[in-house]
C-alpha cells in the first residue's frame, strides 16, 4: 500500500474520530410524505435516533444508537411537521450490529438492524436498497429526526430533509456538505438517518453517523449490501 493511500486512510479516520454523533438536520425542511414513508424514529431512555424501514418489522439504523440493556422503541410524529411526542408504534425485540462494528474503532461499520415486536402500519413502506457505490459529486437527500436550528435546546420530533452533496467517497465511507449557499447539514438525533438518491426513485445509498464542521459523515451502504440483505432475511424469518 503506497504512502498516498495510507495518508488518505489516516486523514479520514482522524476526521471520523473527531466528529460528534449526528443529532439533527440543521437548516432543513420538513420532509415530504414520500420520505416519511421510509423513515422512522427510534427512541431509548437516553435519547433518539433515526431508522430506515427495510421491511414492516425490520429497521436499519446506526450501531452506536444501541446501548446494551436499553429498551428501544420506534415511533413517528403526528404528520405534517407537527412537533409532538411520537406515537410508540412498536418495541424493538432484537438487534444485530454489523460484525465488524466496535465502539473503540471509529472506522468500523456503524450499522445495526432491528427487529420489531409489531409490524409497522401501512403508511410505512420498505425502502429499496441500492447496490451502487457513492461517488464524489453525487447529490443525496438526507432525512432525520431532530432540531431544525442550531440554537434549539430541545428538539421537537419532526422529520426533516435536506439536499447534500458527496465531497469525498472512500472505502465504505462518504463525507457530505450542503449544496449551494445553504448552511444545512447533519447536527447533534440524525444518527441512522437515510441518504436517498436524488434522481428517480428514492433508493437508499447511505446512513448518517456523525457530523463535524458542518460536514456530514455517512456509511456508504453498497459495501455492506450483502450483510444487510442476509441479516434482514434471517430476522424476517423469526
Predicted regions: what is each one?
Residues 32-38, 48, 53-66, 70, ...:
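C-terminal subregion of chymotrypsin/trypsin-like serine protease catalytic domains
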Residues 41, 60, 73, 111-115, ...:
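Soluble periplasmic/extracytoplasmic beta-strand elements of cell-envelope proteins
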Residues 16-24:
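Bacterial Sec-dependent signal peptides at the C-terminal "C-region" and cleavage site
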Residues 23-34, 67, 71-122, 129-132, ...:
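Conserved catalytic-core segment of clan PA serine endopeptidases
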Residues 8-16:
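Bacterial N-terminal signal peptides
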Residues 1-8:
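Bacterial N-terminal signal peptides that target proteins for export
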